């Protein structure tokens, strides 16, 4: 039995019409900050920080409930896709089981 689940979502955001880093940050930073407030997630800008027309963001969460992790990451992905004038060109979700817990009698009955 798993103690919990760690979920990670990465998304590549592309904005080929953007001409400089300042303009790109003005598009990406607000959605990153809103994700942190709206969902129980850790959010980071992972790649493309020096590129003016694309960036990869990552989000992570942890819980003892697999379904909750999966749904939270899906809601975060949908939110990012709907929020910006950028295009989401790739999205990857990975959920990993962590640890092993002890079974109790209640779990055996489920």
Question: Where are the regions a protein language model picked out?
Answer:
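A structural signal for short, well-ordered beta-strand segments
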Residues: 9-13, 57-59, 91-93
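SAM-dependent methyltransferases
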Residues: 2, 108-110
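Short, charge-patterned binding micro-sites
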Residues: 44-64
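C-terminal structural segments of small proteins and small subunits
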Residues: 65-102
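N-terminal first-folded block
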Residues: 2-38
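Short, highly charged C-terminal tails/helix-capping segments
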Residues: 49-54, 93-107
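A short linear hydrophobic-aromatic micro-motif
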Residues: 40-47, 90
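Short, charge-dense linear interaction motifs
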Residues: 74, 107-108
């Amino acid at each position: 039995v798993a103690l919990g689940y760690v979920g990670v979502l990465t998304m590549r955001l592309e904005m080929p019409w953007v001409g400089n880093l300042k303009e790109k940050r003005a598009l990406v930073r607000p959605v990153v900050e809103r994700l942190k407030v709206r969902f129980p997630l850790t959010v980071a800008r992972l790649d493309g920080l020096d590129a003016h027309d694309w960036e990869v963001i990552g989000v992570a969460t942890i819980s003892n409930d697999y379904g909750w992790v999966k749904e939270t990451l899906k809601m975060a992905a949908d939110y990012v896709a709907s929020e910006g004038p950028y295009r989401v060109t790739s999205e990857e979700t990975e959920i990993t089981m962590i640890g092993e817990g002890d079974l109790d009698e209640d779990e055996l009955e489920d």
